[in-house]
Amino acid sequence: MNLSLRRSTSALLASSLLLTIGRGATLPFMTIYLSRQYSLSVDLIGYAMTIALTIGVVFSLGFGILADKFDKKRYMLLAITAFASGFIAIPLVNNVTLVVLFFALINCAYSVFAIVLKAWFADNLSSTSKTKIFSINYTMLNIGWTIGPPLGTLLVMQSINLPFWLAAICSAFPMLFIQIWVKRSEKIIATETGSVWSPKVLLQDKALLWFTCSGFLASFVSGAFASCISQYVMVIADGDFAEKVVAVVLPVNAAMVVTLQYSVGRRLNPANIRALMTAGTLCFVIGLVGFIFSGNSLLLWGMSAAVFTVGEIIYAPGEYMLIDHIAPPGMKASYFSAQSLGWLGAAINPLVSGVVLTSLQPSSLFVILALVIIAAWVLMLKGIRARPWGQPALC
């Protein structure tokens, strides 16, 4: 990796960290903000948050696909500008509808940045560097989510608007970093490999369909597992013990990701992807079974969370490698945009968990999640078979 590419990569990783700190400092407190500023009831807040998050994911799909037609450096700068504008606008407006729309803009912009960031890595890095850098980026995201919420807690005690201003300030530095150090993406001509940029390609690629469905199910299991666990513990115990469990599970998850993500992710390659993804699935299942038997033991909750997190550590770079492998040159952002639909799995987890916990035995929740992650693994294998692994992506 030459000096220019190393600077560009470092600038993008730092930008990813800062933007995530800003988002982490605000997202957990949006419910408090809507309640305190606009006196919304709990159910209305739930509707507002769901609408904003869903709009963000859906629109990021379209904007992410279009990113393949433009310079990715400029596209990331535009996404960060929209991200910062949303945070600046929310404290200044006095209309709940506008607040929800600006929050949707923030989520859309963040998703677009994440998609284009992956595409930039895929276009500019060597095959041996991609999974290593993506693992580092995933570590940066987890560090951001570790720093952001406590920082937001300190600020919200001073003023409900301060977390939004912090997020806007955090956005300013990435704009500077990217403008100065990130090199422009060279236009990739896909016709040399027989493929032409077209959204229709996404609909015709069976491997992409299977991988996206697999990502949806995997996200459903791991994307919101902390809230899922808290819902479960509140049913079998009480709110106080739920807080203790979450206080154990989240630090274990963050510590495991920060310390192991790079060392595990860098070992992923086409030769061992199936074996490692199978091992990751097994870790998910063992962790979920462990949750069932953890009961009142915080030690067992922590140990189960550690095993569960190993599955997450393997799946994150593994899913990236699968999509990068099948995406034709010049359509990386389009493919990562389609993959981002899988994030909707995490969005519906709290709703489904609530229904399961009120309708079935509480332990049924983790049995269902174990079956879901096994289904995700099966769909992932179908995707690999649909596109011969180890061969160039063809359309």
Question: Model-derived features: where do they sit?
Answer:
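Short amphipathic helix-loop junctions that connect adjacent transmembrane helices
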Residues: 29-43, 227-246
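A late C-terminal transmembrane helix in Major Facilitator Superfamily
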Residues: 330-359
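Helix-to-loop junctions at the C-terminal end of transmembrane segments
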Residues: 59-71, 260-273, 357
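Cytoplasmic helix-loop-helix junction between adjacent transmembrane helices
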Residues: 104-141
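Juxtamembrane intracellular "pre-TM" segments in multi-pass secondary transporters
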Residues: 1-6, 184-213
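Residue-level signature of mid-helix packing/kink "hotspots" within the transmembrane helices
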Residues: 53-61, 145-146, 254-262, 346-351
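Structural signature of the two symmetry-related core transmembrane helices
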Residues: 74-88, 275-290
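Symmetry-related core transmembrane helices of the 12-TM Major Facilitator Superfamily/SLC fold
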Residues: 163-180, 366-382
